[in-house]
Amino acid sequence: MNKMKMNGKESYFWKNKEYIVLLTAIQGCLILMRARANGIYHAQLRRFHDVFSMELIMCIISSIIYSRIKELIQPLAIVLQDSFKTFALLSIFFSHASLLFFYIYLPDNSLISTLLKFNTILSLMLALFLTTAGYAVTRSAPVVNRVNVKIRNLPLSLDGFTIVLLTDIHIGPTVNKKRIEEIVAKTNALHADMVAISGDLVDGFLSNLIQPTLPLANLKSKYGVYYATGNHEYYYGDTNEWLHYFTTKFNITVLRNTNRNLCSSSGDCICIAGVDDVLTEKLRIPDHHTDAEHALNGCSQTQPVILLVHQPNGASKILRSTKKRIDLILSGHTHAGQFYIVWLFAYLKNDFLYGLYRIKNSDTQIYVSSGVNYWGPPVKMLNLCEITLLTLRTSS
């Protein structure tokens, strides 16, 4: 999967300004009609206006959800794609119909009334199926998502340079040592030039998680393992204890507003930089803050620059504040929405949700991983527990 998107979120609906103008005009007319109406006519008009507005909001949400479903099922066979699309459209249709039937009288012996029990059972079975399937995803081995990234003026000696991106490992109460061993083994099997960990590596106190973290010592790559903090590292005790532990026990290079140059045998170099998570700006922890300018100091403007930033919103903030060269930002945090009932909130809250984006009017790209594991309940949508293998390619 290699998705290129412009400026993050753009659904078909928002690209068509005539729809916005038409709907605004309709809303204006309804408001004027309500203002001039009296008695029962006013009450009926108000009811119609309420239903129209709710259906409009649901249409916007449905459009976003359907476009996202189409993206998620692209890797599947055509027959499966059609099945998922049909199921999604039927679900959307019945969701809209259920709102209308709230205002339409149905006789006691109507088909819908007689099927009420069946519909309730079907809903419960569907919820159970989706939850069970989501749990199975988190118990299965992570998928390897291979992505080619074209970098402007990438030296030929670095063409084909590979990076394994791991995000949101969330070592904690439900992510045990065996799971980490599985992730490490699958990562090492890719024989990447570099391993990048973009935040949320741990989700607990150091004293409780020493054993589950031990397999991290076996992570291997040609140029080493590089790591930048996420928000969850700041939720448990002293973050510096974790950072010292990673550095001394596992030989992981922690990039706290710093960078390293990785050079090929011909002398061509890539600058890999990382920043503290943007959450530090709210927490006001001494010596912890996001400082992209400092992180990029020492990165030549003539060499490719890769920046580890855990949260996509933090990446957006950096792009608005710096003019220094950044070719590729590696992020996570969103879990690609993780599960159906929270996907919309993740979509609306984050500037970039999942996949490879090219920033408009620049040479900067950002890849947002769906994460190796999960946050909270151990459920996730299909193929969203991922290890990403990024291959850099030369682009003139």
Place the predicted regions along the sequence by residue.
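Non-catalytic terminal accessory segments
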Residues: 1-140
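Alpha-helical membrane-embedding segments
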Residues: 76-82, 107-119, 144-154, 176-190
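Soluble catalytic domains of enzymes that build or remodel membrane lipids, polysaccharides, and related
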Residues: 153-396
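Binuclear metal-dependent phosphoesterase catalytic core
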Residues: 11-20, 24-40, 48, 93-99, ...
